[in-house]
Each structure stands twice: as C-alpha cells, then as structure tokens.
Amino acid sequence: MIDNNVKNNIDESTLQNEKIEKEELLESVSTVDNVIDPKNDQIIKLKIQLAQLQEHERNTVLRLTAEIENIRRRNTQEIEKIHKFGLERFIFELLPVIDNLERTMSISDNSNTLLSAIIEGIELTLKSFLDTVHKFGLKSIYEINVPFNPEIHQAISIIESEDHKPNQVLTMIQKGYILNGRLIRPAMVTVSQSK
C-alpha cells in the first residue's frame, strides 16, 4: 500500500514537472515567435512533440499497470472460490449416503442384542463421516419450530395448525445442507398455516 502511494506521488510529481516544462516551452515559442530561425523552431516543436509522447506513454504504462493489478486480484479471488467450492459436487453426491445412514439409525431396533453391535458400528461410521465432511465446511439444516426461510427451506406441504404460528417449520422431511455459506440442498419441510 505504501509502495503504491509513493509510486503515485512520484508519478504525480513527474507529471507536474513535465507539464511545467511543456508550458515553459510553449511560452518561449510564443514570445520569440518569428525571431527564431527555422531550425530552432523545429527543435522546439520536436521537444513539445516528444513531451506529449512521453506523457502518453506514461499514461499507458499506468493504465496497464492498474489493469494487471486488477487481473491479479480477480485471479486470487477465483482461486479462493475454487478452493472453497471445489468439493461441492463431490459432497453433493455424498448426501444420499448420509441420508441412508441416518434413516438406518432412525429405524434401528436397539432391543435386539444381535443387531446392537452392527447398529453401534453404523452409528460410529455415521458420526465419523459427518465429522469429516464438517471439517470441509458442510453444515446441515435440520431445525424445526423455526420460521420458514425460502432461501434454505423447500416447503413440501402446508398443514393448518392452531398450535403453531403461521409459516413455522413443523417437520423435517429431508435435511438441507450448506457448504461454506452456499446452499447445496434445501431442507424439505412441512410448514404451518393458520386456519
């Protein structure tokens, strides 16, 4: 930042010095007018033309430098996006696996001693799997009895209810997921409506 300010100050002072030189040359041309011989007149015109070309080149360099800096900044932002959302498609394909493991856990019967070890293994696998995807920025949307938010919820059905406020999420049909702040699947819910 300091380098840019110093560079801008140097560029501005150089431009001001060149403008002063240019004005002095123009004044000297106007005061002497026809008294100067043709060679000196031509030299002065060439110096003026040279000063104009130098100013034009300096402006071009400044403009191109700014454009290069903008390109670098955009590339940095694009790389950050790629790192952040590069896993989006992969994680989206894993969501049905998470759903199936959760469904298995919800219908499992812990009273059967033969299956309890298998159920415990599935539970540990699901926990480990969820911990791993959470490390990469995946968050689930699963709250009920919250206001319906069309940005993260998809209403599957509307149920009339006097016990709940209107537009409240009553039940969760399928969890939704957000990856690094970006919705990758909305939560499918039922919503309350007043009678």
UniProtKB/Swiss-Prot annotation:
- Show the CDD domains listed in the entry: GrpE
Tell me which Gene Ontology terms the entry assigns under biological process: protein folding
Task: Enumerate the InterPro entries for this protein.
Answer: GrpE, GrpE_coiled_coil, GrpE_head
Question: Which terms in the Gene Ontology molecular function aspect does this entry carry?
Answer: adenyl-nucleotide exchange factor activity; protein homodimerization activity; protein-folding chaperone binding; unfolded protein binding
**Classification via SUPFAM superfamilies:** Coiled-coil domain of nucleotide exchange factor GrpE, Head domain of nucleotide exchange factor GrpE
Location of the protein in the cell: Cytoplasm
What's a GO cellular component annotated to this UniProt protein?
A: cytosol
Oligomer status and interactors? Homodimer.
Q: What does this protein do?
A: Participates actively in the response to hyperosmotic and heat shock by preventing the aggregation of stress-denatured proteins, in association with DnaK and GrpE. It is the nucleotide exchange factor for DnaK and may function as a thermosensor. Unfolded proteins bind initially to DnaJ; upon interaction with the DnaJ-bound protein, DnaK hydrolyzes its bound ATP, resulting in the formation of a stable complex. GrpE releases ADP from DnaK; ATP binding to DnaK triggers the release of the substrate protein, thus completing the reaction cycle.
- Protein name as annotated: Protein GrpE
Q: What are the leading ranks of the lineage?
A: Bacteria, Pseudomonadati, Pseudomonadota, Gammaproteobacteria, Enterobacterales
